[in-house]
Amino acid sequence: MTSPFKVVAVSGGTYRPSRTLVLTQALIAELGQSLPIDSRVIELTDIAAPLGATLARNQAPAELQAVLDEIESADLLLVASPVYRGSYPGLLKHLFDLIDLNALIDTPVLLAATGGTERHALVLDHQLRPLFSFFQAITLPIGVYASEADFDNYRIVSEPLKARIRLAAERAAPLFGGRSELLKIA
């Protein structure tokens, strides 16, 4: 048996309950259907205070340093962000400002985002993808965007969103030798 792949998920929301966290957890669960994974979820809200007070990596408290090390050592990074005013939160960007410049080279990154309406869906390609291209990470071609209409009481109720989550996980699996039925899009 192969050892599990280390999936580190960053949920970029700062509120609870959080649709971004629900989407993150759904993606992890679906990845676990195709791959042996060991996952860790980092919630931005849990590290917001020490993160905001850290201006440079060498000033990071031990708790935050451990989070940065986890992100840098991921086999697969899942980054999910809420969308505020057309982009991801500044605190999420600040987290990645503290990541070593070369740490994410060739690391697969699955991108996800949540927003109020579909008009923010392009944040995946116009905001998040360029950030991880800078790190020379491998952003997976299929990202997952969810709007408020896809949820009811912080539960995913949209069948198209559920299908998109399955598709994203199935497309990620072959990168790690996992099984994939490779759903075809008509």
From Swiss-Prot:
Catalytic reaction equation(s): FMNH2 + NADP(+) = FMN + NADPH + 2 H(+)
InterPro entries: Flavoprotein-like_sf (IPR029039), FMN_Rdtase-like_dom (IPR005025), FMN_Rdtase_MsuE-like (IPR019912), NAD(P)H-dep_FMN_reductase (IPR051814)
Keywords, comma-separated and alphabetical: Flavoprotein, FMN, NADP, Oxidoreductase
EC number(s) reported in the record: 1.5.1.38
GO MF terms held by the record: FMN reductase (NADPH) activity; oxidoreductase activity, acting on NAD(P)H, quinone or similar compound as acceptor
Family: Belongs to the SsuE family.
Name of the protein in its database record: FMN reductase (NADPH)
The organism of origin for this protein: Pseudomonas aeruginosa (strain ATCC 15692 / DSM 22644 / CIP 104116 / JCM 14847 / LMG 12228 / 1C / PRS 101 / PAO1)
